[in-house]
Design a protein with these regions (language model features):
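Conserved motor-region signature of P-loop NTPase helicases/translocases
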Residues: 115, 161-201, 208-275, 642-724
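Conserved helicase motor core of SF1/SF2 NTP-dependent helicases
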Residues: 267, 275, 279-283, 288-292, ...
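P-loop NTPase Walker
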Residues: 1-41, 191-313, 719-720, 727, ...
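A structural signal for short, well-ordered beta-strand segments and their strand-loop junctions
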Residues: 100-102, 227, 262, 575, ...
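Alpha-helical nucleic-acid-binding subdomain
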Residues: 250-548, 555-563
């Protein structure tokens, strides 16, 4: 061991000793604070005097409750902070830091050794930093700078100086395995080790291997919208999650994880990335799929189709007579032009076109749709649209109140009163005594007739409950009828926003109307329908969310992005995607995020391109980039491996037998995650049924919420964003993948592989494979 390595190991030992001392302190303080919280909860009501005899006593009770709640909240906050710090220290025990820069600040004379780890550490005085958090301003030089003149930016301005050296450490269980001086951001030795490992059931976040271009994403803070367009395996998702950790660190006094929202592609992906932020010492941000949001808003009224059911239709239903009509609808309803059309239609409703529902009780009208319509377009026409609806709602409430009052005198009510229980009589009686301020000592009493009136009031109010709810929720507006009307009336023609309609417009309208009548809402209609509903009834925005992260952004339509922008008006946005993996029909013919630049305007938008692919071995990347136009811009990381293999087979039986053998071979090589990737969910289910005899094989569906190690059968579109040690592409034939519209789907399947890629073909291989023939080994089973 060299003298320098010996000195560095001594420092590691000292730092770990300090970490252990702090762990001991925090374990004690965490236990103490936990007990404080338990004690406060246990004695909460003992320390509060509840007295409601008069207003002053009641006010004193409220103040006492608030004080106790504040004490509890402070104790819980202290316990949370102590627990968080304890968790950070425990993670640092084995690997306290991973890098070092030697920096001589201009005008300061001495060179400072800056050690960098996943969290900061100071000495016992709290004044000297032993380790700097990777997110600290000074740490940016480790990722961005090479030895020589360098600077980093602090809240007080730039700090300049000379970066003399940059060191990298591989530390395991407190022992330095290796250390080396490097002039690169991250030495290939560390990156090779990391990338050569097996895929895991959760995404790893390894801040020691952040590359310079990824660091630009992480620390970007200059525009409202950041677009990251990255090749498959370029690390865009992990960089974006590290970006969230960085923002939580930088703005820790005014930003919390609850104010950050990640739109994930599916539930399984949510599970896959769930460990990244906790690994970095931060709480998980909120996660939701866009479909979950649509269901939350619309599933009470409709059976809402999900995006994967739509995609399954696109992939498997080309024989449907309505296929071309629906495809045209999918494409047009995803456009900004359709978004503008709905806004224009909403403007037209100011003058005419609103459709209302009757409000009735027991079949008798309280207000007919015609009366409501006439009232809306006659009264308060100078007010804003939403205020006109509020006035209309107030008028309806008055009508319902009068109808309810009149109903109390009806014979059915009097008959029902004769059948009420003693308990109901007692409740009405007690209510009236309290209402009139009678105490137990009062000599006066409630008149029996008043009790009967109170019972009648309660009984009718229960029956009218649905009507009141209907008015509160503006259920008297017939949104489905207005949406259908948009396809057939003057609203579509004269107020359409100027965009040219598809030739199939009338047929699209007929299909949409028919399905709405059946209570079904297609995926391509869900966001437009919700937008129309919001524009009419009043937009429900969320101003508490300050940052929105959209992964697999190529799967979102321009329409959906416009909707998300309106939904979170106070938020910045980071979107990540790769149009070479755009598998949904609405993205046909789109190859970049140009349309997103208009979301907030070019001056508020930055674009970062990630062209280096780290996930797969060089042979796999060389093959996959040959599958797509412009693929030569993708740069493979120089990690050796086996050439992808295409095996031609005669029939399905031969294919299945060969897959069984290949799975066995991959397992023997030590691969823990193996995916058999199919074109569709229907094909996946069939393949799983055939291969269910393979030990530990699992079927992944759109309902799967967790990815586990082993062998999985999975449709391509659910595998996006996830990586596997070895991938088997099921039947990569020209019959399966022969249309240009399937090129991106095929590319997505092949780019899931980290170490091994095996393709099978029954008959003629896909034309996409033939175009990349120079980068694949071929064999056949006769």
């Amino acid at each position: 061991m060299s003298q320098e390595l010996k000195q560095e190991q001594q420092r590691v030992n000292q730092v770990i000793g300090i970490i252990q001392d702090q762990i001991d302190q925090y374990e004690e303080s965490t236990a103490r604070r936990r007990q404080e919280v338990v004690d406060i909860r246990k004695h909460f009501w003992e320390d509060v005097t509840v007295n409601t005899d008069n207003f002053d006593d009641f006010l004193e009770t409220i103040i006492s409750l608030r004080q106790q709640s504040e004490v509890l909240s402070l104790s819980q906050g202290s316990h949370r902070q102590a627990s968080k710090r304890l968790s950070q220290l425990q993670r640092m025990q084995d690997v306290p830091y991973f890098g070092r820069i030697d920096f001589a600040e201009e005008g300061m004379g001495d060179t400072e050794r800056v050690y960098i780890g996943v969290s900061s550490l100071t000495d016992a005085t709290g004044e000297k930093f032993l380790i700097y958090d990777w997110r600290a301003p000074v740490s940016s030089m480790y990722y961005d700078c090479t030895p020589g003149p360098a600077e980093y930016v602090t809240p007080g301005g730039p700090i300049q100086g000379i970066l003399e050296q940059k060191w990298q450490y591989i530390i395991r269980s407190g022992v330095i395995q290796s250390m080396f001086d490097t002039r690169l951001t991250i030495g290939d030795e560390i990156l090779q080790q990391v990338l050569g490992q097996s895929a895991d059931t959760h995404m790893r976040s390894i801040v020691a291997t952040i590359q310079q271009e990824q660091n630009r994403i992480i620390r970007h803070d200059s525009t409202r919208l950041l677009i990251v367009q990255g090749a498959a395996g370029s690390g865009k998702t992990s960089a974006a999650l590290q970006r969230i950790a960085y923002l939580l660190y930088k703005y820790r006094n005014r930003l919390t994880a609850d104010q950050m929202l990640l739109f994930s592609p599916n539930a399984m992906f949510k599970s896959y990335v769930s460990s990244v932020l906790p690994e970095l010492g931060e709480e998980n941000m909120q996660q939701v799929t866009f479909q979950e949001y649509l269901n939350h808003r619309l599933s009470d009224s409709f059976d809402v189709e999900d995006p994967y059911t739509q995609l399954e239709y696109v992939l498997t239903a080309s024989d449907d007579p309505n296929y071309n009509v629906r495809m045209a609808g999918i494409r047009f309803k995803a456009t900004k032009a359709f978004f503008d059309r709905i806004q224009s239609c909403r403007q037209a409703l100011e003058k005419s076109g609103m459709v209302f529902r009757d409000i009735s009780f027991k079949g008798k009208p309280i207000a007919s749709a015609e009366q409501i319509n006439e009232r809306f377009y006659r009264e308060h026409t100078t007010l804003r649209f939403v205020n006109r609806l509020e006035k209309l709602s107030e008028w309806l409430k008055e009508l319902v109140k009068a109808a309810e009052k009149a109903e109390r005198r009806k014979p059915w009510v009097q008959d029902a009163i004769e059948l009420v229980s003693n308990d109901e009589y007692q409740q009405a009686y007690v209510h009236l005594r309290k209402k009139h301020g009678m105490t137990e000592e009062s000599v006066e009493d409630v008149d029996l007739e008043d009790v009967r009136k109170e019972l009648a009031r309660r009984m009718v109010r229960r029956k009218f409950k649905r009507i009141w709810q209907n008015i509160r929720e503006m259920g008297f507006i017939d949104i489905p009828a207005i949406y259908k009307q948009m396809f057939v009336s003057h609203l579509a023609a004269s107020e359409g926003g100027g965009a040219e309609l598809p030739p199939e417009w009338n047929e699209i309208g007929e299909m949409t109307s028919h399905l709405l009548d059946e209570g079904k809402l297609l995926y391509e209609d869900a966001t437009p329908y919700l937008l129309l509903k919001e524009l009419i009834e009043g937009f429900q925005t969320n101003v508490s969310i300050r940052h929105v992260l959209v992964d697999e952004a190529q799967d979102y339509s321009p329409f959906q992005f416009e909707f998300i922008k309106r939904l979170f008006p106070a938020a910045k946005m980071t979107v990540l995607g790769d149009f070479n993996q755009a598998v949904f029909a609405h993205a046909d013919g789109t190859d970049d995020f140009g349309m997103l630049a208009e979301l907030y305007g070019p001056e508020h938008t930055d674009v970062i391109l990630l062209n280096q692919s780290y996930r797969s071995t060089r042979p796999i990347v060389e093959f996959t980039r040959a599958l797509i136009p412009g693929g030569n811009e993708i740069i493979p990381f120089d990690r050796n491996g086996n050439t992808p293999v295409l095996t031609s087979v005669a029939d399905a039986d031969q294919l299945h037998q060969s897959i069984r053998q290949k799975v066995k071979s991959f397992r023997e090589q030590g691969h823990r995650t193996i995916a058999i990737i199919c074109k569709s969910a229907a094909q996946s289910a069939s393949v799983f049924e055939t291969l269910h005899d393979i030990d530990d094989i699992k079927l992944i569906t759109s309902g799967s919420i967790e990815y586990k190690q082993g062998i999985v059968v999975i449709p391509v579109y659910l595998a996006k964003g996830i990586e596997f040690d070895a991938v088997i592409v099921y039947n990569a034939s020209d019959e399966e993948y022969g249309e240009e519209g399937l090129r991106r789907l095929f590319y997505t399947a092949c780019t899931r592989a980290m170490h091994e890629l095996q393709l099978y073909s029954i008959g003629e291989p896909s034309r996409f494979v033939q175009g990349a023939a120079a980068w694949i080994a071929k064999d056949s089973i006769s």
